Amino acid sequence: MGRRAGTPTTKKVTQLVNVEEHVEGFRQVREAHRRELIDDYVELISDLIIEVGEARQVDMAARLGVSQPTVAKMLKRLASLGFIQMIPWRGVFLTPEGEKLAQESRERHQIVENFLLVLGVSPEIARRDAEGMEHHVSQETLDAFLAFTQQHGTSAE
């Protein structure tokens, strides 16, 4: 619903930030998107190994809603980055660096999810929203979420 010509607007319009700030904001978003897939795959591999004892491409594809060739391509990328080791006929295993990344990702997710729960968001929505948000918040914001959660409890009780 647009406003008519000649009618004053009551909403305050946010001014554009300077060019450097704008560029930095978009750079951070691009970097977060790049890391998002890596984090999600590494965390899923860790979860599958913990829950079912192995991480198979077919299981990853099913859980991520993608094709097996898509998973295979990403696994090659993760291996080249040093996060996983693929052993033929045995599956996918995390390297120590991959384990570290999976743990960091899991912790970020938990901090965001707990924060949303304290705000009163339902558990199902908090879990789902945290999955997207965890990749796009700075360490400063995570620290603030954690401090707020510790001050106000760990869930909406």
Swiss-Prot record:
* Subunit architecture: Homodimer.
Q: Which gene encodes it?
A: mntR
KW Ubl conjugation (keyword) present: no
Gene Ontology CC: cytoplasm
| PANTHER family tied to this protein | IRON (METAL) DEPENDENT REPRESSOR, DTXR FAMILY, TRANSCRIPTIONAL REGULATOR MNTR
Q: Where in the cell is it found?
A: Cytoplasm
Name of protein: Transcriptional regulator MntR
Grouped into one coarse class, the protein's main location is cytoplasm
- SUPFAM superfamilies given in the database record: Iron-dependent repressor protein, dimerization domain, Winged helix' DNA-binding domain
Q: Which keywords does this chain's UniProt record carry?
A: Activator, Cytoplasm, DNA-binding, Manganese, Repressor, Transcription, Transcription regulation
Q: Which NCBIfam families match?
A: PRK11050.1
